Structures are given as structure tokens and as C-alpha cells.
Amino acid sequence: MSSPEPQGEPQPVSGSPSEFLRNIVGKRVKVRIGSGVDYTGLLTCLDGYMNVALEQAEEWAGEVKTAAYGDCFLRGNNVLYISALEDL
């Protein structure tokens, strides 16, 4: 009796968080960090530690835009959530 051959990496379940994160790379997102500050911008990179790289980034405290950056790097342990600002 032979065992089935490995099929490579397992595919994420449709609608899973890992699929969502893979689909938002290259899209405009909002990232909230632990201090309550939001960053919006184009998600260019995301890794397994939730480290985030944004381009055309803006920093928001509530409804007030406090800064604009060309590039912004957020350390994953500060990230509370990431939400898409455009349709996937």
C-alpha cells in the first residue's frame, strides 16, 4: 500500500485570513497599530511576522491627518489589524 505523494504547500481555505492577506498586497489598506494611530497607503510588502511596508503612506489620529510619508515600515508586533480600502 503506497501513501499519497505530497502536493507541495497546502492551499489556504477560501476566505481564510492568509488568502485575504495575500490578495491585498498591491492594494490600498488601512493599518491600525496598538497606540490607536492608523496608517493608510499602498501595501507593498507583508511577511509572516505581520511586518508591513506601505508606499504613499499617511498617518491618521482619529479624523486628523498628522503626517504623510513616501514609504512607511510598521513592525508586526504593533499591528492590531489590516483592512482593505478597495474591493478585492
Curated annotation (Swiss-Prot):
The keyword Secreted does not apply. The keyword Repeat does not apply. One of its GO terms (biological process) is mRNA splicing, via spliceosome. It comes from the Eukaryota. It is found in: Cytoplasm; Nucleus. Keywords: Cytoplasm, mRNA processing, mRNA splicing, Nucleus, Ribonucleoprotein, RNA-binding, rRNA processing, Spliceosome, tRNA processing. PANTHER family: SMALL NUCLEAR RIBONUCLEOPROTEIN F SNRNP-F (PTHR11021), U6 SNRNA-ASSOCIATED SM-LIKE PROTEIN LSM6 (PTHR11021:SF1). Belongs to the snRNP Sm proteins family. SmF/LSm6 subfamily. This is U6 snRNA-associated Sm-like protein LSm6. It comes from Cryptococcus neoformans var. neoformans serotype D (strain JEC21 / ATCC MYA-565).
